[in-house]
Amino acid sequence: MKRILINDETCMACHSCEIACCVAHSKSGTLYGALAEAPQLASRLHVEQGGKGRGFPLGCRHCQDPHCVRACVSKALYVNPKGVVLVDEKRCIGCLMCFIACPFGSIEKGSKAQEVYRISKCDLCAELDEDPACVTACPTKSLSFEDPDDFSRNKRVKYLIELANAPEAVA
């Protein structure tokens, strides 16, 4: 299954991914429309600031055996056939058990609807027929949408090419 993978060496914490996420999940699909919506949209991905001015975008990891799905008492959280963890907002009762169960803190307390908090989490832009909006918006290509095995292989190949092109050490 493809996942959003992060190159923390190139992320400059510009938050373009967060903005793209809000716009992609807005009713209007535009930045100005998203800003005007009430309740205000929250990104389903968050850039956490690290040391030395570096950022690290964090979102749902779409685990193979998700704790959040097991903790959901109303069965609002489920895994679709592609392996994406999704939420059926109509079934969500706002108990926040999934929020507590997620080991990555990737589930957010969303908007309050009818006195019940709904949750908000990354859905890999499942309704789009393309890469997730955050990946497309990243100006440094720090986010990629690919199979983790391919990502790992490509990283090894890149390292080997760099190693092969490095000047020999002088003793």
What are these regions (language model features)?
Residues 1-9:
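N-terminal beta-strand motif that seeds the catalytic metal site of vicinal oxygen chelate
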Residues 28-70, 90-91, 96-171:
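Flanking helices and flexible, charged tails adjoining ferredoxin-like Fe-S electron-transfer domains
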